[in-house]
């Protein structure tokens, strides 16, 4: 069993169907991420600066799906709205104090990934983005290294088949780049 499944076992996840519709069921994090998993709600917030750069972090290997470049990602917990979850996640992972109005939540996507160690992903993930100009104080529990990457370069690497980004990041990039307000960062 993956050690990552011991992280935040008390989290109460919102179960959803393949289209993000709530089923009314609440489940603990360990059960949600133990193979084959139970579909639950998540959100990823891409953070851009005004120079059209994505602020990304290297995800620790000890985390489920670790060892890749990623944006802040979390579960929408029981009693939270997606925007509230995004605010919580930005504070927890990057030390960014934001409010719900600063996060643009777009559509979502359903995906599954089995890591072969008893842990998996089985989520409907909402794509979101925010623009940030202040200082970032990364949380070492979530961040090995923090770097700014030109957003266009990241999208080009994804199109070329790069494996340094997780599947949920690839899908979030697709959704944000297709959005009227999000696409300007990738031009």
What residue spans do the PLM features occupy?
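Residue-level structural signal for beta-strand termini and adjacent loop
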Residues: 28-29, 60, 142
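Nudix hydrolase/Nudix homology domain
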Residues: 64-68, 78, 109-113, 119-187
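The catalytic Nudix box helix
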Residues: 56, 71-106
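A glycine-rich, hydrophobic loop/mini-helix early in the fold
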Residues: 40-75
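Short hydrophobic alpha-helix segments
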Residues: 26-27, 58, 109
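A structural signal for short, well-ordered beta-strand segments
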Residues: 45, 72, 105, 126-130
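Acidic, metal-coordinating catalytic segment for phosphate/diphosphate chemistry
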Residues: 2-44, 48-50
């Amino acid at each position: 069993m993956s050690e990552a499944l011991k992280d935040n076992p008390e989290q109460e996840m919102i179960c959803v169907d393949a289209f993000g519709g709530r089923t009314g069921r609440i489940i603990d994090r360990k059960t949600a991420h133990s193979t084959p998993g139970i579909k639950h709600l998540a959100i990823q917030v891409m953070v851009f600066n005004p120079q059209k750069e994505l602020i990304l972090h290297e995800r620790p290997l000890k985390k489920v799906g670790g060892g890749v470049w990623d944006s802040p990602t979390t579960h929408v917990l029981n009693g939270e709205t997606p925007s509230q979850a995004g605010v919580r996640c930005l504070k927890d992972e990057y030390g960014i104090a934001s409010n719900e109005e600063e996060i643009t939540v777009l559509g979502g996507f359903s995906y599954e990934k089995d890591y072969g160690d008893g842990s998996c992903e089985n989520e409907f993930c909402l794509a979101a983005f925010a623009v940030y100009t202040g200082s970032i104080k990364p949380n070492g529990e979530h961040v090995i290294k923090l770097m700014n990457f030109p957003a266009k370069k990241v999208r080009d690497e994804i199109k070329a088949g790069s494996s340094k980004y997780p599947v949920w990041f690839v899908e979030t990039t697709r959704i944000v780049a297709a959005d009227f307000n999000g696409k300007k960062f990738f031009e």
